[in-house]
Amino acid sequence: CGCVVAATGSAAGITYLMGGNYEEITYAIKNMIANISGMICDGAKPGCALKVTSGVSTAIFSAYLAMQHSYADSTEGIVEDDIDRTIRNLTRIGHDGMQVTDDLILDIMTHKQ
């Protein structure tokens, strides 16, 4: 879901606007990736507004946690100590992992009763 990527950028920006430094911004990004990276896209529709709401509220929450130096560490799923590797892990899921998922979602949507 594109909301995950957009909201992660928002979390970084919110943290910066709150006076956060580079380290705290990486904390916010890690919080976002640990929290909503599993959100899937199931087609553009009114339900997307719900996902945007989840992304925005999670971005704000992640920024607040980051400013308190509370963040998901490398014991949490796809999060690694290095922020670049963490982002690459999310990218791998979006690029490689979602190909089969997209086909499955489309199959479910086209075979509803």
Give the positions of each predicted feature.
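Functionally critical mobile loop/hinge segments
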Residues: 7, 14-113
